[in-house]
């Protein structure tokens, strides 16, 4: 199913309604399309949120996805205890293992993912069979090369995966 929205408010209302009607944990990506939706949110989200992917850059780099969500936590729109992300600036296998154990216990029903400029989502640039829910990649075709991301296996367990694409040549947004 494909939906086209005339403006960001329509998309925001639609996305918030999906989140509100679903109390299960959510997987949400970073990226500009997602930021454009969530920067206008004014209602508290009580769901557990897993950040789908993170770039391995310095903790306060503008390239980090979690910094945007930290702002939502400070505004008390997301509960800190309900936000799960990879917070280290480098790959740490022990930390990744702990994060996997936490993620494996959760039953995600919905994923809300922005589509990147080259069609990628959640730092997944190629099909990979990963046995764990969250893994590291060292060869991303986009900067930076080193990232952590949710596996396709874990994503496929969601009942609903929403892809948000910003159509730059048009003045509307789409969900695919």
Please state what every model-predicted region is:
Residues 1-26:
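N-terminal glycine-/serine-/threonine-rich phosphate-binding loop
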Residues 27-33, 113-117:
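Glycine-rich beta-strand-to-loop/alpha-helix junction loops that act as flexible
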Residues 39, 50-60, 121-125, 160-164:
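Active-site histidine-anchored catalytic micro-motif
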Residues 45-112:
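Ligand-binding beta-strand-loop-alpha-helix segment within the catalytic cores
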Residues 24, 109, 159:
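Conserved acidic residues
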Residues 157-176:
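ATP/nucleoside-binding phosphotransfer catalytic cores, i.e., glycine-rich phosphate-binding loops
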Residues 41-48, 77-78, 153-159:
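Short, conserved loop/helix-junction motifs that constitute active-site signature segments
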Residues 111-113, 117-153:
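Class I SAM-dependent methyltransferase SAM-binding "motif I" and its flanking Rossmann-like core
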């Amino acid at each position: 199913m494909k939906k086209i929205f005339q403006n960001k408010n329509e998309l925001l209302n639609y996305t918030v309604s999906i989140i509100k009607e679903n109390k299960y944990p959510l997987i949400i990506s970073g990226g500009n399309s997602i930021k454009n939706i969530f920067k206008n949110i004014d209602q508290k989200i009580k769901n557990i949120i897993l950040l789908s992917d993170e770039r391995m850059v310095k903790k306060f780099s503008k390239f980090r996805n979690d910094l945007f969500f930290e702002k939502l936590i400070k505004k008390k729109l997301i509960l800190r205890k309900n936000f799960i992300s990879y917070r280290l600036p480098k790959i740490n296998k022990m930390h990744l293992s702990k994060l996997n154990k936490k993620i494996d216990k959760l039953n995600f029903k919905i994923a809300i993912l922005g589509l990147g400029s080259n069609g990628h989502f959640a730092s997944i640039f190629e099909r990979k069979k990963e046995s764990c829910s969250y893994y590291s990649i060292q060869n991303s075709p986009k900067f930076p090369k080193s990232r952590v991301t949710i596996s396709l296996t874990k994503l496929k367990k969601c009942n609903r995966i929403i892809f948000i694409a910003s159509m730059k040549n048009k003045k509307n947004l789409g969900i695919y």
